[in-house]
């Protein structure tokens, strides 16, 4: 829906072999953590291993397995979440292509096929942010 605004430009960071980027919800309403069905993080064509991906929102960090039952934390349209994974970024002076893929379920929209599932993607080019 709002795919070109998923990745917040200039938020790529790297620390201890992990890369992270801030992401915004590509939907117009808040969703509970249980509706974040999956994500992928790729830098310069290399994907972070799925089992290393972590989702941070509201100062809490979750694996995607933990998000399945998470109804206490919500992702709001005005708030950024952080997607991170084991993915070293070696050259912090170069421009890097960052891609985020998100899978969301929208529980209040029911179709003939069940609950609405959306997949959105965004790619941006940026340098590693200086901390």
Curated annotation (Swiss-Prot):
Q: How does activity depend on pH?
A: Optimum pH is 7.5.
Q: Give the keywords, sorted.
A: Carbohydrate metabolism, Lyase, Magnesium
The effect of temperature on activity is: Optimum temperature is around 40 degrees Celsius.
The source's superkingdom equals Bacteria
Explain what switches its activity on or off, per the activity regulation comment: Activity is strongly reduced in the presence of chelating agents.
Q: Sorted alphabetically, which InterPro entries does this protein's record hold?
A: CGDB
Annotated Gene Ontology MF terms? lyase activity
Q: Which cofactor does it need?
A: Mg(2+)
Swiss-Prot/TrEMBL catalytic activity: 3''-dehydroisovitexin = 1,5-anhydro-D-erythro-hex-1-en-3-ulose + apigenin
Enzyme Commission designation: 4.1.99.-
- State a single Pfam family of this protein: CGDB
Top EC class, one word:
lyase
Summarize subunit and interaction data from the UniProt record for this chain. Answer: Heterodimer composed of an alpha subunit (CarB1) and a beta subunit (CarC1).
Function noted in UniProt: Carbon-carbon bond-cleaving enzyme which participates in the metabolism of C-glycosides. Acts on the C6-glycosylated compound 3''-dehydroisovitexin (3''-oxo-isovitexin). Shows weak activity with 3''-dehydroisoorientin (3''-oxo-homoorientin) and 3'-dehydromangiferin (3'-oxo-mangiferin).
Task: Give the family, as the similarity comment puts it.
Answer: Belongs to the C-glycoside deglycosidase beta subunit family.
* Protein name per Swiss-Prot or TrEMBL: C-glycoside deglycosidase beta subunit
Which organism is the protein's source?
Arthrobacter globiformis (strain ATCC 8010 / DSM 20124 / JCM 1332 / NBRC 12137 / NCIMB 8907 / NRRL B-2979 / 168)
Which gene specifies this protein's sequence? carC1
């Amino acid at each position: 829906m709002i795919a070109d605004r998923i990745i917040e430009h200039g938020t790529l960071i790297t620390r201890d072999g992990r890369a992270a980027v801030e992401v915004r919800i590509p939907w117009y309403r808040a969703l509970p953590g249980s509706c974040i069905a999956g994500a992928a993080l790729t830098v310069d064509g290399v994907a972070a291993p799925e089992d290393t991906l972590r989702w941070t929102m509201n100062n809490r960090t979750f694996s995607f397995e933990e998000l399945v039952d998470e109804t206490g934390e919500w992702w709001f349209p005005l708030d950024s979440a952080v997607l991170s994974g084991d993915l070293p970024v070696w050259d912090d002076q170069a421009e890097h292509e960052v891609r985020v893929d998100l899978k969301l379920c929208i529980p209040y929209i029911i179709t003939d096929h069940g609950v609405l599932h959306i997949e959105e993607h965004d790619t941006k080019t940026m340098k590693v942010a200086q901390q």
